Amino acid sequence: MDSISVTNAKFCFDVFNEMKVHHVNENILYCPLSILTALAMVYLGARGNTESQMKKVLHFDSITGAGSTTDSQCGSSEYVHNLFKELLSEITRPNATYSLEIADKLYVDKTFSVLPEYLSCARKFYTGGVEEVNFKTAAEEARQLINSWVEKETNGQIKDLLVSSSIDFGTTMVFINTIYFKGIWKIAFNTEDTREMPFSMTKEESKPVQMMCMNNSFNVATLPAEKMKILELPYASGDLSMLVLLPDEVSGLERIEKTINFDKLREWTSTNAMAKKSMKVYLPRMKIEEKYNLTSILMALGMTDLFSRSANLTGISSVDNLMISDAVHGVFMEVNEEGTEATGSTGAIGNIKHSLELEEFRADHPFLFFIRYNPTNAILFFGRYWSP
């Protein structure tokens, strides 16, 4: 696992530990890597205590080689920004089997003139960059401009990211971070096998869901001590996989959420733990869109200066009092039957009906899932599916 992927995984669970407190019994979906990238772009211009807090919360202090370049135009953290640039260009390169759009942008009020050195370094490493807008006298126009940029960047899937009250004349800087994902499975689910089935949120409460079904060989970990199974579903390119962490019992998710962390996940999904098995898999069709204001989460993790008058962002603008007013994360992901290889047509229906001897992986109650970039083990998405 490379150093950025480790940093990303640690940050992923820090965020999850905060999110699960604020989103009890709800679906959760976020992209730790894109949040980290957007914050790295801010970190480029952070100085003093603000920089120290960010370095700690983002786990940049654990990256080997970080801080080794001191003569660079873009500061001592150039090594870290280069790692992000390499990983992001690898993951988002044009690919016929999945669509992944990560969009990060800093919107700064025009009264804080952005330093040309910062602009040039932000452009060097990050695609989104910085845009100056007029929050003070045209806040509503700025909000609409940001929303239309987000909609365009996410293929029209994320609309109205910023609600009408979120921007006002006191806003100084907003960081926007959105991600859209649609993947194609290595092996397709047959649409004819998809059925409406109950999805149990609790022992007493259930909702109908369109449940996809397939018989095939998958990597599976059976973990009796954790009362859980983990299934790996590969996407077509082989570069990405979805891993589903399914508790044995309907009410078993809380137990997993209490114990999960970076080291545990690495242990549970290691090659020693997972083995190829013929399985009968049931997985809900999912379309998840989530929007989060990350300000309170990041402050709870220890990044307090950035969102207050104590912020030192003199690497972005020499004008005093520049701070982040809002940090907004929008994410859209769709999971359906599409794949590159058919599972067989009429034969597969027969298989589904007459496969009682196969071990089942039936995701018909709350579970955790994540999408992994296999070459580096980076976690792209992390989520909880609680309810259809």
Swiss-Prot record:
Subcellular location: Secreted
Induction entry: Down-regulated by dietary stress. Decreased expression at day 14 in the magnum of the oviduct in the corticosterone-fed laying hens.
Superkingdom to which the source organism belongs: Eukaryota
Organs and tissues of expression: Major protein of egg white. Expressed in the magnum of the oviduct (at protein level).
Keywords: Disulfide bond, Glycoprotein, Proteoglycan, Secreted
Glycosylation sites: N95, N215, N293, N312
Keyword hit for Cytoplasm: no
Post-translational modification: N-glycosylated on at least two Asn residues by ovomucoid type carbohydrate units. The N-terminus is blocked.
Gene Ontology molecular function: serine-type endopeptidase inhibitor activity
Signal peptide: none
GO (cellular component) term, any one: extracellular space
Pfam families: Serpin
Keyword Transferase part of the UniProt annotation: no
UniProt-listed InterPro entries: Serpin_CS (IPR023795), Serpin_dom (IPR023796), Serpin_fam (IPR000215), Serpin_sf (IPR036186), Serpin_sf_1 (IPR042178), Serpin_sf_2 (IPR042185)
Annotated positions for site Reactive bond homolog: K353, H354
Positions of disulphide bridges: C74-C121
Listed PANTHER family: SERINE PROTEASE INHIBITOR, SERPIN, SERPIN B4
Family stated for the protein in its record: Belongs to the serpin family. Ov-serpin subfamily.
Name of the protein in question: Ovalbumin-related protein Y
Organism per entry: Gallus gallus (Chicken)
Name of the encoding gene: SERPINB14B
